[in-house]
Amino acid sequence: TFFIIADNNILNGYMTNDMIKEVSESGLVNIGSHTRSHMLMQYGKLRRDQEIAGSKFDLETLLGKPVTAFAYPYGAMSKTIEKEVKASGYDLAFRIGPEVIHTSSTRYGLRRIQVTQTDAIPGLIKTYTPKK
């Protein structure tokens, strides 16, 4: 899943709208929302709604299909923000952490590892391969 920061992609040139559509249409990659500006925790409810629901709307308009996954900026969340993400129509949301997902995990606080543009595949494999 590629989690897209809707405004940053346009402003900072990470991916063009055409690139986002192309990877989505490939069927190999799902597109999820990562807010409009990568800010969230410091905002009040109205601005958080614009970030959470607005990013979903922007991406769904671009792609012409539902965006069902959300990733919290910096992996940070609260119970209040979790409720707002759920109310915005997402099916699941992710935070950062190596913990195992189990039956008591909430769909709106699933853990994933963070992969950035500076991470190399061999290093990730070494880091996350269980030790013998």
Q: What kind of region is each of these model predictions?
A:
Residues 1-28:
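Active-site beta->alpha N-cap acidic-glycine motif
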Residues 4-6, 35-38:
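Short, histidine-centered active-site or binding-site loop motifs used for metal coordination
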Residues 19-26, 30, 36-132:
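C-terminal active-site subregion of NodB/CE4 polysaccharide deacetylases
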